[in-house]
Amino acid sequence: MERILENAMYASRWLLAPIYFGLSLGLLALALKFFQEIIHVLPNVFTLAEADLVLVILSLIDMSLVGGLLVMVMISGYENFVSQLDIDDSKEKLSWLGKMDSSSLKMKVAASIVAISSIHLLRVFMDAQNISTDYLMWYVIIHMTFVVSAFVMGYLDRITKH
């Protein structure tokens, strides 16, 4: 009975595979939105104010960071919890493939969230005259919460490894 239960629990890790595949569909949706933004801004690039162009570029950077985060979570999550990826060595292989455990993934996700939050905060500050002081304060508080959380996670990870 114990062996059956253990085998069933071990096999249940495959339930994560469609979730990781779903993230790839999210990546596709993000790519479509990215190119929609590019197509929307290109005809107006010569008439846009510099600040508005910077806001669009920050939005594109934000989307690329989210896309990178999706790829990282998808691939390393699959490798850590479902099955090892069998990529032919003759093909291009990501340098971190097979080397990122759940702890390092957690730190990379935290760093990515801080970077994404920083870009969003910069975008908010560029439009600060149209945003109330209370909202600005909450944006900063939320961003600092992400920053402090990332530092605490890094510190805890460091002291548990030693």
UniProtKB/Swiss-Prot annotation:
Transmembrane portions of the chain: 15-35, 53-73, 136-156
GO cellular component: plasma membrane
Disulfide topology: none
Keywords assigned: Cell membrane, Membrane, Transmembrane, Transmembrane helix
Membrane topology: Multi-pass membrane protein
Localization per record: Cell membrane
InterPro entries: UPF0114 (IPR005134), UPF0114_bac (IPR020761)
Family affiliation: Belongs to the UPF0114 family.
Database matches in NCBIfam families: HI0507
Protein name, as recorded: UPF0114 protein PSEEN0819
